[in-house]
Each structure stands twice: as C-alpha cells, then as structure tokens.
C-alpha cells in the first residue's frame, strides 16, 4: 500500500521535470524530432501513475477492512470477557458507540488520513528540495510561507483534540438514551412520560449539536487559513518568476516546472486541516477503545477442568464486597450442599440473595473465603467447564433477538428436539410451539413480543435444558400466576432431584421444593434447616414468609 503510494508520488513529480525538458528543448529549439519520445515518456508516466493509484486503492481497501474486522472482533471478545463489575459501571450506549462509530472513525483515518499524511509529508519534503534546486530564491519564498501554516496547525491540533473527545462522549450519551428509550418504551408509554423522555433526548441532541458546530467552526477557520496562504504564495511566485525569466535568471521551462511542482503542494497543504482533524478524531477514538481493551479482567480462567461434575457445592467463610473501599455485602457464609440437595435461599429484599447466587458461576468473585464444586475452588477452574456445570435462571430474564429455539438452546446448542420439548414441558413453556412459526419464531429484542411470564418460562427452559450439575434459580417463578407456578414446581421436583439446586424463594410453595432452607439476614446465613424447623423456631422466618404471601395475594 505505502510502496505503491510512494511510487505514485515519484511518478507524479517526474512529469513536471519532463515538461521542463520538453519546453526548454524541442519547443524552444524547434527540434521536433525530440518532441515525440519526450511526449511518449510523459504519457507513459501518466498511465503508470493511474495504474499505481488503482493498485494503492485496492491494497488500501483490503488492508483497512481486515484491520477493522480484527479490531471489532478483539473488542467484542474483550467485552464478553470483562466481568459484571465492568458492565455495571458502563452505559451500554457508550460501549456501542465505541464498537461502531469509533471503529468507523479509525477505519476512515487508516484508509485515507494516515496514508495521505505520510504521502503528503513525503511530497512536501521532496517538492521543497526540488524547488530549491530549480531556483532557490523562489524556493525560499515557499519555505517562508510554510512557517505560519506549521505554527497554526500545532495550535489547531490541541484544540481539535479536546473538542473531538467531547463530541464522541456526547454521541455515546445520546446512543444510551436512544437504546434505553427503545428497550423501555412500554414503561414510557404506560406512565405517559413520552414528552419527558423526548425533552431529555432533545437536551442531549442540542448539546451534541452545539459542540459539533463549535468543532466545525474551529475546523472552518483553519481550512480558510490554509486556502489563503497557498494562493498568496502562488501570486508572489508568479510575479517573481516572471521577473526572473525576463532577466534570464531561469528558463521558461524551469518556471513552468517550478509552478507545476508548487501547485502540486496545494492539495497536501489544503488537505492538512482535514487530515489533522481526522488524526485527532482517530486518536480520540483509539483512546476510547483502549479504555476497554486495556481494562484488566479480574475474572480469568483457572488451570483445572471440571470433569464429570457431581455437584457437591460448598461455601467456606465466603465474604464479598463490590469495591475495596465498600462494606461487605456478604460475610461468613458457610453452606454445604451434597449432590442432589436443593437449598431454598430466603431473605428480605436487599439481603444479598442475588449476589450470593452470582458468586457460584463467577459472575463476581468472592473477596474472602472460597466456593468449591466437588472440592475444586471455582477460581481454579476454567470458566468454560465451570459454567457448563452451573446453569442460572434469573428473576429478570434476558432473551435475545433470535428465534425461541435459539434462545432455549443457548446453553446447549446440540440438544435434540426431544430434549427441547421436555425442557419446555417442565418450564410450562409449550406455548412456544404455538407461536406463528413455532420455535423458529423470532421473539424480538429482549423478548419484548412475549409477556413477562412467557419470557421467564423460556429462560427457565433454557436453564433446565443445560442439564447442569448445579442449577441456580434466582426467583424465576415471580412472574407466573399461581396455577402455572404450581405446574412448574411439580415438574421442577424431578429436575432438582437429579441436580444440586439453589432456589431463591419468596413464597412458601417455592420453599417446599427444597430439602433445606437458609435464612439470609444482614449479609450472612443466620439459620439453616428444613422449612418446618425454621417455621417452628425462627420468628423472623415466619414473619418474612407471611409478609411475602400477603404481598402476593394483595
């Protein structure tokens, strides 16, 4: 790519020198016999330049496309590898803008700006040397004219970098608002907050518009300056050059070659503003992307594989905090779940139930103690083997914009049709067979074409289909009516009998699925026993279940 570009510059700069030879030779001396070979040489150089431009563009497009694809792949893989802690701190719109608009900015610079930055600098240096060799007084005039351009360019670079960063950050904020409005449109309509949300969007859009106008205004002033200086220099060179020809200091051919070479500098100089602007935007985009690529993942693969897991799950003095300077959310957690045991986790809202269940598949890592499966610390296991042994279904089910079948088989793509139907029956999700195109029906983004209960049942079917050694159900029955819940619970008994289960429960009927019940209060397990034992001996447990039942039936 660069080699063809450099050759192209060399060929284009040779043409004015051939023109000088034609004017000062055959034309001035009227030697027609020399005109044909020199003319053919000029024609050959022009054709060569065209071919080199074609080769450069082909190589340029392929190289840049490959680079963009590689960067996008690396960025996506990195986003998938980063832990929940990272994603909880970042707005999805900011991440989206980095994967899309920032990569496009880098692609444009690598495909156009970087190449021409190198070519133009090379051309400026070579042409300046040629101008000085052709007639040094006029060459000095060109050099003097370049000084203010360099000074202004350096000042422009600093200002443009700062304003480009503001524009790109505001684009990310606006993308976040658009995404949140699209995902939460039902809530917006239900509460009649369309105008309120629209005003928030308009405020962000106006802010972005004003910053973008400031950016264009700054660039326009710089580009105008770059237009004026070369044109003034051309006028001066024409005047002084004509005088030099009149005094026979240089030949007419030399003046024509000088002016032709000088005119070849106009594009590099005029494009300097555009290229520097692109460079600053690309630097800003690269910095924004580096914020993701350079983030260290705190949750990484361990050295061991979990082979033929039995599901013996233990919590040993487990504690957890979200950040080093925060208080413990969980502390002194000790539980022992032999294979095939189901534990119901009961606690008030905010007591840490969801956080505790998230520690098992290492969505977060414990900050104290350890969790083991079959005697292996989960931190010593590869993430693939751990998460194939642990399946989770959450109270807020996530479905993807794909078919119902693809959503269900996400954790087990090779599942047979019989296994899929069995999982649907257990989760009471056979309604999926009655969708317009059956299981091949696309459920829309976040599964918005389905009801809350339907989404929850599909998510439960997905977890059941995975056939894990450890099954974590984080209040996955909360959106079901009493009748459907009873049917699901009856089917789940058979599933839980063959696996180790943790069930976050708010209703007595769900608690009855478990062999043991653990009461979580103030971030720690205060009581463990059967439902009957806790109901008889722990007033706080009775009060909590009674309150939950009243809320359900209210």
Report the location of each language-model feature.
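Transmembrane helix-loop-helix hairpins at lipid-water interfaces of multipass membrane proteins
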Residues: 2-52, 132-137, 248-252
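Short intracellular "coupling" helices and adjacent cytoplasmic loop segments at the cytosolic face
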Residues: 65, 73-97, 101-103, 176-200, ...
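An intracellular "coupling" helix at the cytosolic face of ABC transporter transmembrane type-1 domains
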Residues: 84-88, 101-110, 114, 118, ...
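Helix-loop-helix
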Residues: 28-37, 130-144, 218-287, 292-293
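ABC-type nucleotide-binding domain
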Residues: 301, 307-554
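Alpha-helical transmembrane segments of multi-pass membrane proteins
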Residues: 45-64, 115-122, 141-169, 219-222, ...
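Membrane-integrated ABC transporters
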Residues: 1-15, 27-38, 56-60, 64, ...
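Transmembrane helices of ABC transporter permease
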Residues: 1-7, 41, 112-166, 239-250
